[in-house]
Amino acid sequence: MKQFLDFLPLVVFFAFYKIYDIYAATAALIVATAIVLIYSWVRFRKVEKMALITFVLVVVFGGLTLFFHNDEFIKWKVTVIYALFAGALLVSQWVMKKPLIQRMLGKELTLPQSVWSKLNLAWAVFFILCGLANIYIAFWLPQNIWVNFKVFGLTALTLIFTLLSGIYIYRHMPQEDKS
């Protein structure tokens, strides 16, 4: 259910884009993201930090898109989010005692420190590459291609990378944890 909620604003954005235009889609994205945030608070009494950060960026970049009637702002939002994710992972890698990935998953999984570090770095690189791909597609290709890439391409890439990360984790888990 929670994963569905995370994708709901993206689905709403895509539907409004196909029916109306980028500006209606942006307004719908802001509203849908707010509704999901409110629902998460009411239902689970908790809002994830990343969901809150994403909401703030959606409101800021979406608001700028609507105010200036310029779709470049909403296109930049994707890259800014990925840059923040990558930055947080890299800072945790080099400044904190534990990589961020380990802080998020370390209670459920027992892995060697080197595996946590490689996984954390791999996700940082993934987010950097996705952000760069977004810049290229957003500003060098037609808007409809960017929307499709944002909705389907980045989602598919994230699911594939998550699957590959799961395989990598499984290969490095202690034998007793694999069952």
From Swiss-Prot:
Q: Where are the transmembrane segments?
A: 22-42, 50-70, 76-96, 121-141, 149-169
| Tree of life domain | Bacteria
The reply to whether Zinc figures as a keyword in the UniProt entry is no
The family database entries (InterPro entries) matched by this protein are listed as: YciB (IPR006008)
Name its cellular compartments.
Answer: Cell inner membrane
Which key words tag this protein in UniProt? Cell inner membrane, Cell membrane, Membrane, Transmembrane, Transmembrane helix
Q: Which GO terms describe its cellular component?
A: plasma membrane
**Coiled-coil ranges per the record?**
none
The UniProt entry lists membrane topology as: Multi-pass membrane protein
Q: Does the keyword Transmembrane apply?
A: yes
Family membership: Belongs to the YciB family.
What's this chain's function?
Plays a role in cell envelope biogenesis, maintenance of cell envelope integrity and membrane homeostasis.
Q: Which NCBIfam families match?
A: ispZ, PRK00259.1-2, PRK00259.1-3, PRK00259.1-4
Protein name in UniProt: Inner membrane-spanning protein YciB
> What organism is listed for this UniProt entry?
Escherichia coli O1:K1 / APEC
**Taxonomic lineage:** Bacteria, Pseudomonadati, Pseudomonadota, Gammaproteobacteria, Enterobacterales
